[in-house]
Amino acid sequence: MNMDLKRFQIRIRYCATCNHEPHALAVLERVLKYKMALSEVILEPVEGGVFEVLANGKLIASRTEESGFPGTEEVLTAIRKARSG
């Protein structure tokens, strides 16, 4: 592993009352394929229709910002971009 690359805490915030959990788990499954780039992964159930993915506290994907659920590939691309600089 290249130690110059950043390791990330990934936080997936999802609306538990809106049944967003299946999408959160699908994103989690894909994110875990990059486990050597991760320092921590957090699933955070919230309310209010929220579905967000944050990398080290910075919003990288959002259902409300993107007018729909971010795809797993979109999330992985955002993580790769954040990692590389």
Task: Tell me the role of every PLM-derived stretch.
Residues 35-36, 83:
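A broad structural signal for alpha-helix termini and local helix breaks/kinks
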Residues 60-85:
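Non-catalytic, surface beta->alpha helical segment in thiol-disulfide oxidoreductase systems
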Residues 40-52:
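Amphipathic, hydrophobic secondary-structure cores in small proteins
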